[in-house]
Regions:
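Histidine/acidic-rich helix-loop-helix segments that form or flank divalent-metal centers
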Residues: 230-238
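Hydrophobic packing residues in well-ordered alpha-helices of helical domains and bundles
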Residues: 36, 79, 83-86, 117, ...
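ATP/Mg2+ or Mg2+-diphosphate-binding catalytic cores
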Residues: 253-306
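Residue-level recognition of alpha-helical structural elements
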Residues: 79, 137-141, 238, 263-267, ...
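Active-site acidic catalytic loop and adjacent metal/ATP-binding pocket
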Residues: 10-15, 149-197, 207-208
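ATP-binding pocket architecture of kinase catalytic cores
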Residues: 3, 12-119, 123, 130, ...
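Secondary-structure capping and boundary motifs in well-ordered enzyme cores
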Residues: 82, 116, 160, 165, ...
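Active-site activation/catalytic loop segments of kinase-like enzymes and analogous catalytic loops
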Residues: 122-131, 194-230, 242-262, 274-281
C-alpha cells in the first residue's frame, strides 16, 4: 500500500494484465470517485497533465490509473524550473479544463459559493480554534467571517468559467521526465483562479519566501493572460490576499481535525508553520488588518502557541 497523508482512499501499486505498472485506487465514497473519474477522463482527453485511467469497476468504487512514479514536487521545492512549470500548467487546467465541463458531477458541491466558504470557515472555528482553548468572541468572529464571505462572493457578479482545483499543493504534483502531472483533484469545482494560487504558494511546509511567491505569481499570470486576454491583473491581485486568508483558515481547520482529533503527526507538525503564515499574511497586508481586525488579533494570540 502506498503512503497517504489526509486521504481515506487506499492506493496500491500493481502490474496489470498488460504488464504495465498501475496504481489501483479503492475509494470510500462513490460520488467522490465518480467526480475524479469524470475529471480525469475530461482532462486527459484535452491533453492536460493528469494520469490516464485504465479501468473502472462497475460500481465505480475502484479504478486503476497510470503510474506516474514516486517523485513529488514537494521533494524538489528548490527547483525553480519545476515550480514555474507547475504554475503555468495550473493555468491551463483551470481555463482549458473548464471547457465543456459538466459541473454537476463535482463533489461535494458544483461551485465555490457562499455555503462552501462558510463550511471552510466553520472548519477553522470548530476543528482548530476551539481546540486551542483560546478565548474568543463568536459574534465578532462571525462578523468578520461575513465580511470575508462578502468580499469573496461579490468581487465578480458572475462566477468565472474556470476550474478550481481545491487542493493544489506540491504533494499533489507528480514529476516525471521533468514535467508536472496533477493528481487528487476530485474536490475540484467551478470557481476563481486565485484560490489555487493561494493554496500552492502559501502551503505551510513549502515555506516559500515572499520574493519567490511573487516570481511564481508573475509566471502564472503571464501564462493566464495568454488564456484569458481580458484578465484584469490589478483586480486579480487585489483579491488574492483574501483568498490566501480563506485558504489558510481552511488549512488550519484541516490540520486541527487531522492532527488534534486523528493524531496524525504530519498535520500536527504543520500547525506552527500555518500559524506563522497567517500572522505573516496580516503583517504584510495593512488592508487585511483594517478589514479583519478581530482575525488579526486572533492571529497574534495564536502565534503565542508556536
Amino acid at each position: 500500500m502506498l503512503k497517504q497523508q489526509g486521504s481515506n482512499r487506499i492506493y496500491t501499486r500493481e502490474t496489470d494484465e498488460n504488464g504495465r505498472s498501475v496504481i489501483r485506487v479503492v475509494g470510500t465514497n462513490r460520488d467522490e470517485n465518480r467526480a475524479f473519474i469524470y475529471m480525469a477522463r475530461h482532462f486527459h482527453a484535452l491533453g492536460l497533465p493528469v494520469p490516464e485511467l485504465y479501468w473502472v469497476s462497475e460500481d465505480e468504487m475502484t479504478y486503476t490509473q497510470e503510474d506516474l512514479g514516486d517523485t513529488i514536487l514537494f521533494d524538489h521545492l528548490d527547483d525553480y524550473t519545476l515550480l514555474e512549470r507547475a504554475m503555468r500548467a495550473l493555468a491551463h487546467v483551470q481555463v482549458e479544463g473548464a471547457r465543456d465541463f459538466d459541473w454537476s458531477v463535482c463533489f461535494p458541491v458544483p461551485a465555490f459559493d457562499e455555503r462552501s466558504i462558510r463550511w471552510d470557515l466553520n472548519y477553522f472555528k470548530y476543528c482548530f480554534l476551539k481546540g486551542t482553548k483560546i478565548e474568543f468572541s463568536e459574534p465578532k468572529l462571525e462578523d468578520e467571517f461575513d465580511t470575508l464571505v462578502q468580499r469573496l462572493t461579490t468581487n465578480d457578479q458572475r462566477l468565472p468559467d474556470t476550474f478550481l482545483y481545491r487542493d493544489f499543493q506540491s504533494r499533489n504534483v507528480m514529476i516525471r521526465d521533468g514535467q508536472p502531472y496533477f493528481i487528487d483533484f476530485q474536490g475540484g469545482r467551478r470557481g476563481p483562479t486565485q484560490y489555487d494560487v493561494a493554496s500552492f504558494l502559501w502551503q505551510a511546509k513549502a515555506n516559500f519566501s515572499p520574493a519567490l511567491r511573487e516570481q511564481l505569481i508573475d509566471a502564472y499570470l503571464d501564462e493566464l493572460r495568454t488564456l484569458q486576454p481580458s484578465l484584469s491583473e490589478p483586480a486579480w491581485r487585489a483579491a488574492l490576499p483574501h483568498f490566501v486568508l480563506l485558504r489558510t483558515l481552511q488549512v488550519l481547520g484541516a490540520y486541527g481535525y487531522r492532527g488534534y482529533f486523528e493524531r496524525k503527526p504530519h498535520f500536527l507538525e504543520s500547525i506552527p508553520l500555518a500559524l506563522k503564515n497567517l500572522h505573516a499574511l496580516f503583517e504584510a497586508n495593512a488592508d487585511l488588518q483594517t478589514q479583519y481586525p478581530y482575525l488579526y488579533a486572533i492571529s497574534n494570540d495564536l502565534l503565542l502557541l508556536v
